[in-house]
Each structure stands twice: as C-alpha cells, then as structure tokens.
Amino acid sequence: MSPASEFAARFIGSYNLLSKEQASAIFDVQDKGLYAVRPESIYVQEEGGIYPGTCSSPVQGTVVSHQLLGNVIRYRIAALGTELTVDVMNRSSSRLYAPQTAVRLLFNLAEIKPLAH
C-alpha cells in the first residue's frame, strides 16, 4: 500500500519523507513535492553485498543511533540534510554500526513514491 499524501505517509507508518531537493541528490526528480521511502527500501552498503539493480548510487551518511527490534536493527542515519530511518535485518553483531560511524546508503529507486501535492 503506497501513501497518496504526506498525511497518509505519516499515518500509515514510518515512511521517510524527502523534499524535492533531498530526492534530487538520489535520482532525477520529475515532480515537485515530497517523496516517501520505506525504511526497508534503504540499504546500508556492505562489502560484497548484493543489491537490487534498481538502487541509487551510494549516498554518504552518519549513524546517529540504533535500536535493536528483535530480527531488525533500526538506524537513524544523518544524510541528505535530514535524519532517515533505515531498517536492516539483524543477522549478526558485525552488522551493528555504532553512532558516528560513516556509512554509504543505497536507495531502491523502484520503491520511492511521489506524494500528491
């Protein structure tokens, strides 16, 4: 289910909302307004990782915090002039990045949704 508006994106769940300026750092923006990105549609790039062919070029970020939620690690990562929520599978302690760690993010472009303005 994709949100149709900013209100719906905030109501439905933990979507990251990107402005046109923030989104243009990731892909060629066609619309004005906001873009919604689910936390699981953003990947922390790992050496040797395999990612969908629809991913963006890497975007630099810095880990602000992390929260262990069972089989998911929820990160707050500063990137693109905002703090993004990024969810990754908790497969091992080696995947746990400490605050202030520099990371590279990949956005699944097929899952970035423009919102009605």
Language-model segments: what does each one mean?
Residues 15-17, 25-117:
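Non-catalytic connector elements of ABC transporters
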Residues 1-12:
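Conserved beta-strand-loop-alpha-helix hinge in the C-terminal portion
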